[in-house]
Curated annotation (Swiss-Prot):
The keyword Zinc does not apply. This is Ribonuclease P protein component. PROSITE patterns: RIBONUCLEASE_P (PS00648). It comes from Microcystis aeruginosa (strain NIES-843 / IAM M-2473). Keywords: Endonuclease, Hydrolase, Nuclease, RNA-binding, tRNA processing. One of its GO terms (biological process) is tRNA 5'-leader removal. InterPro entries: Ribosomal_Su5_D2-typ_SF, Ribsml_uS5_D2-typ_fold_subgr, RNase_P, RNase_P_CS.
Amino acid sequence: MGLPQIHRLKHRQDFQAVYGTGKRYHGSHLTLISLEDSCPDAPGPSRFGISISKKVSKKAVVRNRLKRQIRAVIRELLPEIAAGWRGIIIIRPGAIECNYEHFLRELKQLLVKANIIHGH
């Protein structure tokens, strides 16, 4: 099962807003760009987009597999994620060797660093 529609960042203007004014957090294989929604009184659900370039892999099969793994990680972390955030996860070259547990650990660290998940 994929990431629920309500938690997906899909529109070009949303991506541009996050890229333009979002704050960046870097990991070894992932980069998180996050932006808090402009209406803090009534925050909507947090939404995420995934970006992966052909530098990571020329093969679409490999890129799609990595995106599915990241979506599964986000879905697992959703109960801990605060409402009212937009984020883009950029998959960097070298992520091909990573497994699900590595992505889970790294993305959780990035979300804690961005205060989207409150650290333990």
